[in-house]
């Protein structure tokens, strides 16, 4: 198995399993973390709370990178009817509000939506997907289009929106409890107390992934924390990791397949939506989450408050 060393993997090690020199860098950068935390906290005050008449659920995390927000949002959509997903649309080549999907019809391009939004759009149980830097406008548009429930992807820090906050707590925790850049936290860890529900893997949800072994496949991925796929590394002939949200080029993928004499790309669905038009044979790594009763019942109780 080969491995492309890059910035994304360096960040994984820096935040979660630092070596001696990375630990030294952490303390050099600590004054910047204090400033970052100050302004992050300041940004959570002095804004009027906006309340909606229908359920708004936020799935977020405090730490940098992916913790499974996308599969958890999908799991909620499988459990409840009429779910629209609203997200920022990170790394998209557009600005403003775009309706990516409405009632099972995809309405824009990958460039306009971004990879995460397009991944949601291919999920049958999700009735609509909207990207917008302004989450309030996105929520309003979703309800206008008939959403029964809005699920916000990565909106824990939007404290001006009245919502049910689910905070994902991964089994793999940052090495230091500092905010960026000396630690992985985007808000001070004490902000966990502002969550309505802290979802712990194993207790509140079960994460599972599957892909068949294929010696003629090259695993390529551009997701945060690629070590989440560790169990699948040995199932492909070679593995290559790219920066989160990386825009794959057809020629470079062709070269990787030729280099290892392979005919198949092994990738996550988030990666697949970016290469599906290239004509490659693809093998999808299934990444799913199943809700356990503790989380499912909390969400049901919250939704029932709007039925009274």
From Swiss-Prot:
Record keywords: ATP-binding, Kinase, Lipid A biosynthesis, Lipid biosynthesis, Lipid metabolism, Nucleotide-binding, Transferase
A GO molecular-function descriptor: tetraacyldisaccharide 4'-kinase activity
Alphabetical list of Pfam families matching this protein: LpxK (PF02606)
Domain of life: Bacteria
EC number(s) from the headed UniProt entry: 2.7.1.130
GO cellular component, one term: plasma membrane
Enzyme class: transferase
Pathway: Glycolipid biosynthesis; lipid IV(A) biosynthesis; lipid IV(A) from (3R)-3-hydroxytetradecanoyl-[acyl-carrier-protein] and UDP-N-acetyl-alpha-D-glucosamine: step 6/6
Catalysed transformations (reactions): a lipid A disaccharide + ATP = a lipid IVA + ADP + H(+)
Binding site for ATP: 63-70
GO biological process: lipid A biosynthetic process; lipopolysaccharide core region biosynthetic process
InterPro entries from the UniProt entry: LpxK (IPR003758)
Function: Transfers the gamma-phosphate of ATP to the 4'-position of a tetraacyldisaccharide 1-phosphate intermediate (termed DS-1-P) to form tetraacyldisaccharide 1,4'-bis-phosphate (lipid IVA).
Family to which this protein belongs: Belongs to the LpxK family.
Protein name according to UniProt: Tetraacyldisaccharide 4'-kinase
Gene: lpxK
